[in-house]
UniProtKB/Swiss-Prot annotation:
GO biological process, one term: carbohydrate derivative metabolic process
Annotated family: Belongs to the UPF0309 family.
Domain of life: Bacteria
Sequence ranges assigned to domain SIS in this UniProt record: 30-209
Any coiled-coil regions, as ranges: none
GO molecular function: carbohydrate derivative binding
NCBIfam families in UniProt: PRK02947.1 (NF002805)
One Pfam family linked to the record: SIS_2
This protein's name: UPF0309 protein BOV_A0853
Length: 242
């Protein structure tokens, strides 16, 4: 392993170790909200723009994941239809409401809003939309980054029922390179995926203990066809991406 790859591993490991203790109470609160939604036959929606949308894809139809999860996916807020355009789109007031209208978010649901900076128009609008509909809001964001750049703007963390601080630094990248003023090695994705999968694992354990396993099995595992088919049939009505 080279010196810089070693530094990256060490940084991520150190941040995860710190998060495990510092976020324990907030992660438990997030699991409480999601478990309550599952018991009430509600859904957990996941929203993010740009690279943050990967959290929605990570939790959707995932081996070991929860079938109540619904990703909010639209080309205009993702990267594959134009990264520069998506960066512009997420800053336009009112742009994401028509996207959210397609999903039927309602009272008792949970919306996980992922935004590293936590100040762009899209995640703010998504959180406010969820509040209008009576859904609980879990924010996954970098508190340090958001506080640094807010400059009087509304912050996602101020709108959420639960805030999961991913501990990513301002600008996301953590590694300095000799001879350059720029940094490499963003950490928000690695940290965010770990936080959310840990929360969802907690929820799954609770539901299994209550006799209702809502867990997808990897498609290559024996018996996965029948298990996953039943879950898809049960939850397809409110998940357009199944």
């Amino acid at each position: 392993m080279t010196e810089i790859t070693d530094r990256y591993f060490n940084d991520v490991i150190a941040r995860l170790s710190g998060l495990r203790d510092r976020l324990a109470a907030q992660m438990e609160k997030a699991a409480d909200l999601i478990a309550a939604a599952a018991r009430a036959d509600r859904r957990v929606y996941v929203f993010g723009t740009g690279h943050s949308h990967m959290m929605a894809e990570e939790l959707h139809y995932r081996a070991g994941g929860l079938a109540i999860t619904v990703p909010i996916l639209c080309g205009s807020i993702m990267l594959q239809d134009g990264a520069v355009a998506s960066s512009h789109f997420e800053r336009i007031e009112g742009a994401v409401r028509p996207i959210l209208d397609r999903y039927g978010i309602r009272d008792g649901d949970v919306l996980v809003v992922v935004s590293n900076s936590g100040v762009n128009a899209a995640p703010i609008e998504a959180a406010r939309y969820a509040r209008e509909k009576g859904a609980a809001i879990i924010a996954l964001t970098s508190v340090a980054y958001s506080n640094t750049i807010a400059r009087g703007r509304t912050q996602l963390l101020s709108l959420a029922d639960v805030v999961l601080d991913n501990d990513a630094p301002s600008g996301d990248a953590v590694l300095e390179i000799a001879g350059s003023a720029l940094k490499v090695g963003p950490v928000s994705t690695a940290l965010g995926v770990t936080i959310l999968n840990a929360v969802f694992a907690d929820v799954a354990a609770r539901l299994v203990g209550e006799g209702d396993a809502l867990i997808y099995l990897s498609a290559n595992m024996p018996g996965s066809g029948d298990i996953n088919r039943l879950l898809v049939e049960r939850y397809r009505d409110r998940n357009p991406h199944l």
